[in-house]
Amino acid sequence: MFSLKRQQGARFEYQARLFLESKGLQFVAANQSFSCGELDLIMRDQDTLVFVEVRQRKNAVFGSAVESVDWKKQKKWLNAASLWLAQQNRSLEDTDCRFDLIAFGKTTQDLEWIINFLD
């Protein structure tokens, strides 16, 4: 049985996927785990692979969802993407890709999409 926190995380990840699909992106994979971290969603926007981090914060007591993606998390995100691409016999250098953030507030309707968050 998944914990309540994990169930809520899965719900927000699914809502992020639906939102991105409504914007024309195609689903590639979800919850890809590596020793260095996890990729929440991998989507395709035409010829571009999009590695999506999904964050949610009920309130800003410990910072917003956007603020929670610090440099340590960004490094893990890049490393996980690099490992996933290596499994596909590709690399960050030879693949058109970007890193987007979907940040939720308290509800699934409170959504912010930041394209090229790591740009």
From Swiss-Prot:
InterPro entries: Restrct_endonuc-II-like (IPR011335), tRNA_endonuc-like_dom_sf (IPR011856), UPF0102_YraN-like (IPR003509). Gene3D superfamilies: 3.40.1350.10. It comes from the Bacteria. GO terms for molecular function: nucleic acid binding. NCBIfam families: PRK12497.1-3, YraN family protein. Belongs to the UPF0102 family. This is UPF0102 protein PM0647. It comes from Pasteurella multocida (strain Pm70). The lineage of its organism: Bacteria, Pseudomonadati, Pseudomonadota, Gammaproteobacteria, Pasteurellales.
